[in-house]
Amino acid sequence: MSKIIGIDLGTTNSCVSVMEGNSPVVVPNSEGKRTTPSIIAFIEGGETKVGDPAKRQAVTNPSKTIFSIKRFMGRNFSEVTEELKNIPYKIIKGENDTPRVSIGNKLYTPQEISAMILQKMKKTAEDYLGNEVKQAVITVPAYFNDAQRQATKEAGEIAGLNVERIINEPTAAALAYGLDKNNQNKKIVVYDLGGGTFDISILELGDGVFEVLSTSGDTHLGGDDFDKVIIDWLVKEFKVEQGVDLSNDSMAYQRLKESAEKAKIELSSSTKTEINLPYITATPSGPKHLVKTLTRAKFEELSDDLIKRSLYPCKNALKASNLISKDIDEVILVGGSTRIPKIQEQVEKFFEKIPSKGVNPDEVVSIGAAIQGGVLSGDVKDVLLLDVTPLSLGIETLGGVFTKLIDSNTTIPTKKSEIFSTATDNQSAVTIRVGQGERSMFNDNKEIGRFDLIDIAPAPRGIPQIEVTFDIDANGILNVSAKDKSTGKEQSIRIQASSGLSKNEIERMKKEAQENADKDNKIKEEIEKINSADSIIFQTEKQLKEYGNKISEETKKKLEINLNNLKDARNSKNISDIDNYINKINNILSSSYQEIYKNNESVKNNESVKNNESVKNNESVKDVDFEEIK
């Protein structure tokens, strides 16, 4: 069986790992880095850049540089109004209230943008392994709902991957932490604060079994929010000092975002940092510069509410697992934002123990995903993962009530059935509305799908027996069926939210993604060929200048003709002609080296003859002693 790679598809950064024997390996990307920024840039001419190359040009191309797309995955446009305030690129309302990224005259779904990041991860693994990769385990925040999980799976399919399993990020981290601790029985907490989401999971480890006891979280809390409080502070301070509002300047905002992220990182190891942004904007009076010192104490004050927000899910998770903080043996910190000292301090205070620093918070999730891939492929044995569904699942019943069929923190996969009936006499059809959440009224929760059961046998209200079955697979994705027990009539759906994509749309996007990959490869090949042409032109002109007098006029003329032809091909970007003239010039240069060598040998021989004749002439001269006569 081919390798199943593990991908951590993050809000800020992504990472890919593979199993090598019994050990997981984090795979460096083409830039030599172990994590890749989850950033896509659309360049003039149709080229796309992914990762660090995209991040480097963000300041000069803010409207076409896409970041934090994970925050829009599987969500409706009406749900993302706050997120829209924090991005310089354009997102508009698409069909069925879906968010669409607008680039020029083309619209992209969040799944398509995420697929571009996944393609980069796929290519990174393929370059390392030396063969094509088709299967992957992809991680999601534990608190992702069904629609967000479906969207992640769709992104994988668009990228050309068979998504063998969707796994929760804290669970993946626990797998990575506990793989070599099979003989230890422990209760561990995984506190996972990533770029855009926060999760808390409590697991029990022992004898190769990883059982999730409870999970909670906040899908609107992450490192981006910590950056935002710094940005807001800078904007406010600059407006007071200079009277200029930077929040509406997309290029200035992008510079503020980069500086805020750097300041946050520096304050993890320093007590203060200087934010220096010359020429941040200009007014009629001249250019304006932003120079501010941010102390760790001020940053902690700005982010205090965010840190407190992360503790509420911690309380909920403990309560759901019927544990208290003293029952916890180990606390694992995951996600780059957990490097913030105040977070470490608050987590230690809450759980009454020092968090473990034995794992790399940026890499541990992808490592766990690779281990799960190894379990699925049979490379990793004696490991059993028992995950849970993060939110309750149910249907709408009479009066708009949300009736739960599966409670939150139920171990998956699982299946549950209940009998319902009609609300009116002789009702021939019912609409089953499926929801996910913890509120008592259906409309206060997230509707994740609906379908109709028709041709119900006429009967007084309350008589028909309609069996509704919920079936959650190991990916946490839901299938729902409804059956009229008197007629045997059955209707079922694999839940696909309004933000989901049809099979035809996924196939179309897969095709477009491959075409874009081919297009990018063509652009890359074109650049490489032009670079080769420039190198050959330089070398040939240098050879003509240095050795032009040592080759025949015929050879010299051939070189000059083909050199001019290569320059024309290079300027017109004609790849086939560039290859043709490079080959011709290389062949001519090869023969010219022989001419140069022969000329050099001839010169050496002539010098040798002259030296010999000089020696012979000198043989008749004898050395004698002489005495000066005075």
From Swiss-Prot:
PROSITE patterns: HSP70_1, HSP70_2, HSP70_3
Induction (UniProt): By stress conditions e.g. heat shock.
Region of interest (Disordered), ranges: 604-630
UniProt-listed InterPro entries: ATPase_NBD (IPR043129), Chaperone_DnaK (IPR012725), Heat_shock_70_CS (IPR018181), HSP70_C_sf (IPR029048), HSP70_peptide-bd_sf (IPR029047), Hsp_70_fam (IPR013126)
Chain positions found as Phosphothreonine: T197
Functional summary from the UniProt entry: Acts as a chaperone.
HAMAP family given in the database record: DnaK
Annotated family: Belongs to the heat shock protein 70 family.
Name by which UniProt lists this protein: Chaperone protein DnaK
Name of the encoding gene: dnaK
